[in-house]
Amino acid sequence: PSDPGVTSTYLPSTPSARASGTPQRGLFSADEYTSVEQFFAGRPSLSPTPLTSLPALANSPGLGTLLAKDETARFGLNAFKLLGARFAIDQLMHAGAVRPGDILVCASEGNHGRAVAHTARAVGCAARVYLSESVAPPRADAIASEGAIVVRVPGTYDDAVRVAASEASTHGWTVISD
């Protein structure tokens, strides 16, 4: 649900929407927005995080108002990535594609892996998070602290993505991409 004190302007993003004058809330359909709103309405623990007004920054480019969304306190993860992971996993569970006990897999450089691990544990799944060798040990430790098995992959993030996808395919695990 929208904050009654906040007004947003959405520009039609497609030629047909602009031509028809159809109100549009952004990049997604009304059904997609409704689905997301219903998801959050049923989960009070995922309540909206604070919006902080930044008037000095707003004045510089001549904006009326500039608000920053503060996700630093969301489950102690200090990242917004939890919302996307939680929504994606919830949708897969609702569709029957993921069940408690399943193994969820992702490649990450940090926050997405931690969000998948946190959510997997919350819904009774296991998580395997594939990290490139360049990911700092404290990030890997933070992911492991959420209950994930951390798999180090030689090379880059793209190499970790390939290995995660290959192992998920081989073992019948579910990939949660960011």
Spans of features found by a protein language model:
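PLP-dependent amino-acid enzyme catalytic core
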Residues: P1-D178
